[in-house]
């Protein structure tokens, strides 16, 4: 069971809520290797420690905020380099939409989250333009699509983008920002 609370650590023994065993984590690692994909898991600040031997996995690594700080890297620098993003209900997924790259949403605790913390939207799934992930097979499907260049939610992202972001009416974001800051 995954516990999510501002007061408690988040317990994810296999680092992704969609995984239920070490065997599934190993199966995911094998699938990632076959797809030529390297998975970086950014741990939530409240998430408890990694209890497994990281060296046992060829295509899975995790990073913490502390590791990024020591390297002088901001999270969004890393995000800009990613070919895809898996998130839950975090605002980073909304920001990632601007890059127009594949998104996956881990929804294993959707009802629990709805009942405890709640959502901004009544039907949050309608605002998640990406693959819905509940288990290992869904994760494999998401990575398989990325590996072969398939993006089944591209049109849905484009349709939702104006609802999630104020888009500049002119040609570029820099020009719109300069006008907004009154420096042009």
Language-model features and meaning:
Residues 1-56, 135, 166-169, 175:
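Conserved catalytic-core segment of nucleotide-activated headgroup transferases in glycan assembly
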Residues 14, 77, 137-141:
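An acidic, carboxylate-rich microenvironment
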Residues 33, 79-80, 144:
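Alpha-helix boundary recognition
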Residues 41-43, 87, 107:
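Short beta-strand/turn micro-motifs composed of small residues
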Residues 46-94:
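Donor nucleotide-activated moiety binding/catalytic core segment of transferases
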Residues 142-149, 176-184:
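C-terminal alpha-helix
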């Amino acid at each position: 069971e995954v516990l999510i609370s501002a007061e408690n650590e988040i317990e994810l023994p296999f680092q992704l809520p969609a995984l239920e065993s070490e065997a599934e984590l190993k199966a995911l690692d094998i699938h990632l290797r076959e797809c030529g994909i390297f998975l970086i898991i950014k741990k939530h600040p409240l998430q408890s420690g990694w209890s497994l031997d990281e060296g046992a996995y060829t295509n899975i690594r995790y990073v913490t905020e502390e590791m990024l700080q020591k390297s002088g890297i901001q999270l969004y620098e890393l995000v800009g380099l990613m070919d895809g993003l898996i998130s839950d209900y975090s605002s980073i997924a909304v920001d990632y939409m601007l890059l127009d790259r594949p998104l996956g949403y881990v929804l294993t605790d959707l009802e629990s989250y709805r009942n405890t913390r709640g959502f901004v939207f009544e039907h949050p799934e309608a605002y998640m333009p990406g693959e819905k992930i509940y288990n290992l097979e869904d994760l494999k499907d998401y990575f398989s699509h990325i590996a072969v260049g398939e993006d089944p939610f591209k049109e849905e992202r484009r349709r939702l983008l104006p609802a999630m972001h104020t888009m500049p009416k002119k040609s570029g974001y820099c020009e719109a920002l300069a006008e907004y800051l009154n420096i042009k």
